[in-house]
């Protein structure tokens, strides 16, 4: 083996060994090939690119360091959740959100469901905040609020009734920020319960048995070319004057949201493409909660018919 190949092989085998130490080792093991240790050290420094800028092209051990790091460092992890795509055989969707059981508005909720029956929708999309979970909120608790058990019982009755009303429909339940409170409370306040069977919200509500698809709090849904989010996922603390406009400015694409309890619509454009629209839907809950009795909320929902969105407002139980 030639001296160059010999030294490069040692540099590869011992990339972290100091130049002088490596040179002494090479000379000790191959004294017949070199005059002294200093000659070996000169060549080691040369092939490691330590003698100046012109010799950097020989610094192959630096490439080896990179490969070594690639092999030793654990693979990077991503918390990205894969989006849910509405099946292509679905044609008409009823989107309802912000029911906040048991603080729902009877007239508004039943009017929306009746409209869905009339329109013969094949999909029901609960776009977040089916439940309220006031007692396990991070905000100041109102001890006069209903118990968590009562809220869960109401949700069970609602979901069972919904399945009976729409036996053949695809029903999707997307968690909103209020729905998320339950599982989050278990994980943070009572992690000892996590190994108990059927302790999480989806299990307590028997979603699998009711053939209801559950989407995570941060999971996107796509219906045709429209993204559907609850609204808390967006980088905006409030909806401003027009929540639909605020949402459009945040992500610049066709979108339907709830969360802000207000009905609005806004148009956007991507150069070279047709105009698109963003929508924020009204809620189906009580419009005068004790924590915010004065507000600009409205009751509402929407129908998506083959990608065409029609928003509806409910006033005193009448659809407009």
Model segments located where?
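Positively charged, polyanion-binding regions of nucleic-acid-associated proteins
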Residues: 1-16
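DNA-recognition alpha helix
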Residues: 20-33
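Major-groove recognition helix of helix-turn-helix-like DNA-binding domains
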Residues: 32-61
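Mobile, glycine- and charge-enriched loop segments
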Residues: 69-106, 223
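Structural motif
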Residues: 91-93, 123, 226-227, 254-256
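Core catalytic region of metal-dependent phosphoesterases/phosphodiesterases
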Residues: 96, 101-208
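Active-site-proximal loop/helix segment associated with metal-binding centers of metalloenzymes
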Residues: 189-227, 231, 238-242, 260, ...
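Conserved beta-sheet core of the metallophosphoesterase superfamily
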Residues: 229-318
């Amino acid at each position: 083996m030639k001296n160059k190949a010999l030294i490069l092989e040692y540099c590869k085998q011992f990339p972290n060994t100091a130049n002088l130490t490596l040179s002494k080792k090479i000379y000790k093991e191959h004294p017949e090939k070199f005059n002294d240790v200093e000659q070996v050290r000169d060549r080691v420094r040369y092939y490691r690119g330590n003698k100046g800028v012109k010799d950097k092209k020989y610094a192959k051990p630096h490439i080896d360091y990179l490969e070594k790091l690639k092999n030793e460092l654990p693979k990077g992890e991503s918390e990205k959740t894969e989006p849910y795509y509405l099946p292509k055989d679905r044609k008409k969707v009823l989107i309802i959100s912000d029911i906040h059981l048991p603080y729902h508005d009877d007239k508004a909720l039943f009017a929306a469901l009746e409209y869905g029956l009339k329109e013969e929708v094949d999909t029901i999309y609960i776009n977040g905040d089916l439940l309220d979970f006031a007692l396990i909120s991070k905000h100041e608790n109102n001890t006069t609020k209903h118990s968590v058990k009562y809220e869960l019982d109401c949700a069970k009755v609602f979901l069972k009734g919904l399945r009976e009303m729409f036996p053949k429909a695809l029903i999707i339940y997307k968690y909103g920020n209020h729905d998320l409170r339950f599982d989050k409370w278990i994980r943070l306040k009572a992690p000892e319960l996590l190994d108990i069977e059927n302790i999480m919200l989806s299990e307590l509500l028997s979603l699998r048995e009711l053939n209801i698809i559950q989407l995570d709090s941060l999971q996107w849904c796509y219906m045709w070319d429209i993204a559907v989010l609850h609204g808390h996922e967006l980088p905006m603390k409030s909806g401003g004057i027009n929540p639909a406009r605020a949402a459009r400015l945040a992500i610049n694409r066709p979108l339907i949201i709830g969360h802000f309890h207000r009905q609005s619509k806004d148009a956007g454009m991507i150069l070279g493409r047709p105009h698109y629209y963003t929508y924020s839907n009204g809620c189906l809950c009580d419009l005068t909660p004790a924590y915010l009795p004065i507000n600009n909320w409205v009751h509402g929902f929407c129908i998506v018919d083959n990608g065409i969105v029609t928003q509806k407002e409910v006033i005193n139980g009448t659809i407009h």
